[in-house]
Amino acid sequence: MILLDTHVWLWWAGGVPELSARARAELEGADRIGVCSISCWELAMLVRLGRVELDRDVRSWVALALGDDRVESLPLEPEIAAEAGALDHDLPGDPVDRILYATARALDVPLVTKDRRLRRYDAKSTLW
């Protein structure tokens, strides 16, 4: 399994060419693709704030984007929420990024992200 940061999920599901060659190859070869439920919330917030436009309403987009047989929706478990809050101060402070990173660590899977701050924090557990 690989875990997708929200922007990677949006680009992959939307067929946007922003993905790196490595990210695209990892997505094509993955047997399972994890999407955290917090990414659904983040996407809805970005749409509401006008920072992201979708070709349909956000609920329909999420349902369609989670419909791929390889995609697994991952809930925010209490242990992961606690881990995200306890991560050291060097990790970027964005709560969504912290939750995504804690989820990847808990599942021992790579986090696919373009976010340089996350990649600098832990180059071994992230990929782009």
Regions from the language model: what does each represent?
Residues D69, Y121-D122:
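Short, structured coil segments at secondary-structure junctions
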